[in-house]
Amino acid sequence: GTDTIGYSPLILDISNISQGYLTAVSDGNGTTKNIQLSADDGVVYSYFVSSGESAVIPFTSGSGTYQVSCYEQVNGSQYAALFAQALEVSLENEFLPFLYPNQYVNFTPDSEACKLALSLLAEDATEQESIDTVFQYVTQHVTYDEDKAATVETGYLPDIDETLSTGKGICFDYAAL
């Protein structure tokens, strides 16, 4: 995009704020970056971006003022501040942050989960009928994974296709589906 903040080793593309997200782009310097996003509601969302990667970060608290604070890993779990900035977000539609793939809910039209969802839905289904159909499928075909819950590590991100193929998941996996 054309509207960015930050500098190497982390640049935030804020060109799509009105669509409900920003894109964090990390250069390939070998360190992990941490982006912390908080809104007026006080909830802080933390996103980690590996070296040379990018991540879509949604504005899930809706329109308002967000504080974005960016850090770079210096050693183990220690991070140094890179930059911080307040962002004014005015969404075109309150649902937009939830309609794009992001670090927590990563999907493409080619994802098995998307293909399955489309195969389950009738062409003339209403939005509510579609939601009900997918909900019923997930609750009938995915069971809670006690072992995974006991051993999950910090930084875990759901893989919706893996959850569907194994038929098991933890709360984060259910939420991503």
List the predicted regions and their residue ranges.
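Gly/Ser-rich catalytic serine loop of serine hydrolases
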Residues: 167-171
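Hydrophobic/aromatic-rich core segments of domains that either
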Residues: 173-177
